[in-house]
C-alpha cells in the first residue's frame, strides 16, 4: 500500500491544478479490484464517485459493496464493464451457482429467468447511486456473442456494433419509464 499512499498524496497535492485544467469535467474513479484504504480516503477527499458493478454483487456476502443497498449517493452503478459478460450471459442458470440465482431472485423479486435484465435495470435506477450506466448490449438484452471485451484474448474484442433498428420503441419506452419513475433527469 506504500505506492498507493504515495500516489494518493501526489493526487491531493495536484488536485487544484487538475481542477484548474479540467474545470467542471466530471470524473469517475475506477476503484475496482483489491480494496486499498488510501483509495477510499482519496475518493472521500476529492469527492470523485466510485464504481459499483451489479455483476459483482451476488457473491453471498450480504455486505458486499456492490449490492445496491450498500451504495452511497456518491457512486456510479453499472451492470458490468466492457470486460464483463453481458447481463444475459452472466445471469444464465448454467453460468451461476443455484444459491447465487436464488439470492438474485430474492433480492430483486425475479420469478422468471427472462425478467432478470429488466429487474437489474430497475434495481440500479431505483438505487441511491448518482449515475446509472448500462452498456447498449444489456439494454438490448443480448447474449455474450455481443460481449465487448474478453480480457486476455485477442481477435474478436471491441467489434460489436449496434445496427440500425436494434434499439426499438419498446426499448426507448422502457428506458423513459425508468428515468421518469426514478427521477433520473
Model-derived features: positions:
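Single conserved hydrophobic/aromatic residue that forms the stacking wall/gate
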Residues: 1-8, 12
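Short, flexible, glycine/charge-rich loop motifs used to bind or transfer phosphoryl groups or to couple energy/partner
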Residues: 1-2, 17-18, 66-67, 122
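Acidic, Ser/Thr-rich peripheral helices and adjacent loops at domain boundaries
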Residues: 6, 46, 51, 152-161
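Alpha-helix-loop-beta-strand connector modules within alpha/beta enzyme cores
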Residues: 13-22
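Conserved alpha/beta catalytic core and glycan-binding cleft of carbohydrate-active enzymes
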Residues: 23-25, 31-144
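Structured C-terminal cap/extension of enzyme domains
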Residues: 141-185
